[in-house]
């Protein structure tokens, strides 16, 4: 059992979506005490070829310098910061400039090859924040309360199939195309049937988490010319098991639910906001409406700005 949520401001302007998502996820804390995560879109304000790297580094002498040297082989480092974290690790965040998006994944793999270092994400149009602990602990550690954006997705995790650490927390990201993220509640029971064709196409999996499989599946469909709605509709046909998930893109969010409707999901909207979550109590954190709609079995919905 996990909690998922998404919120989109219809005017496409910057709003306090970090605070909104923090409250929405806190209302779902009972669904997942292990870890929590956010993908906040639209607020980074990076230049066209700039990316933000989010890197977990063990706190030991010389290791951060090695990470910086590896990054600088590809790009000069712009602004950067070190966020003290937990369990003898730090989070190193830095802005880089690349000639093309195709350079991003190879750079991440080079950084990941350093012992005791792992890249949590690299993005252009969204900021990813995820860690172990409660929603409010993470919110205070990374100051999600102050984050501005146009839309966001988030997750509270109750682990059932993989280890509990910062890297396995949701959202998951794919580098097949830029800035695609997924949060997920449930299990994909035909995981290997979905994964193996993607690997044969050259897509690289870093974990055995089925959420990573979903995000690569959706990104692969988008790269093949599917619309987001078409990709989600095909996923409902192809994937087995109980699931509901939310995908984040630079343009908005998409929602999909398994054909038997075995995982909860509700949505609502008013003139300003569209929101979706595992439970109604989460929606109430961002709007006051009596018109809450249940997501039907097999339903797909896309809301883009």
Curated annotation (Swiss-Prot):
InterPro entries: GATase_2_dom, Ntn_hydrolases_N. It comes from the Archaea. Keywords: Glutamine amidotransferase, Transferase. The keyword Phosphoprotein does not apply. Disulfide bonds: none annotated. The keyword ATP-binding does not apply. It is an enzyme of class 2 (transferase). This is Putative glutamine amidotransferase MTH_191. Pfam families: GATase_6. GO terms for molecular function: transferase activity. PROSITE patterns: GATASE_TYPE_2. The active site is at residue 2. Its EC number is 2.4.2.-. Residues 2-305 form the Glutamine amidotransferase type-2 domain.
């Amino acid at each position: 059992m996990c909690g998922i949520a998404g919120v989109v401001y219809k005017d496409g302007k910057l709003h306090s979506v970090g605070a909104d998502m923090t409250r929405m996820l806190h209302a779902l804390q009972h669904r997942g005490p292990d870890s929590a995560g956010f993908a906040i879109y639209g607020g980074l304000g990076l230049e066209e070829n700039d990316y933000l790297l989010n890197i977990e580094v063990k706190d030991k002498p010389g290791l951060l310098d090695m990470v910086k040297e590896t990054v600088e082989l590809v790009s000069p480092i712009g602004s950067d910061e070190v966020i003290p974290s937990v369990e003898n690790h730090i989070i190193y965040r830095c802005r880089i400039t690349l000639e093309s998006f195709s350079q991003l994944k190879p750079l991440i793999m080079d950084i990941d090859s350093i012992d005791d270092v792992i890249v949590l994400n690299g993005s252009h149009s969204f900021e990813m924040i995820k860690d172990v602990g409660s929603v409010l602990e993470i919110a205070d550690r990374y100051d999600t309360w102050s984050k501005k954006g146009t839309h966001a997705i988030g997750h509270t995790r109750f682990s059932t199939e993989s280890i509990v650490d910062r890297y396995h927390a949701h959202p998951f990201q794919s580098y097949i195309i830029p800035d695609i993220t997924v949060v997920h509640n449930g299990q994909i029971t035909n995981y290997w049937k979905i994964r193996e064709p993607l690997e044969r196409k050259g897509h690289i999996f870093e974990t055995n988490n089925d959420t990573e499989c979903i995000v690569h599946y959706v990104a692969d469909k988008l790269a093949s010319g599917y619309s987001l709605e078409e990709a989600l509709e095909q996923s409902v046909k192809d994937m087995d098991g109980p699931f509901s998930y939310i995908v984040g893109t630079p343009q908005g969010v998409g929602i999909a639910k398994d054909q038997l409707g075995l995982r909860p999901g509700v949505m609502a909207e008013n003139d300003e906001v569209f929101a979706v979550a595992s439970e109604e109590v989460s929606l109430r954190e961002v709007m006051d409406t009596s018109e809450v709609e249940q997501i039907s079995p097999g339903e797909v919905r896309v809301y883009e700005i």
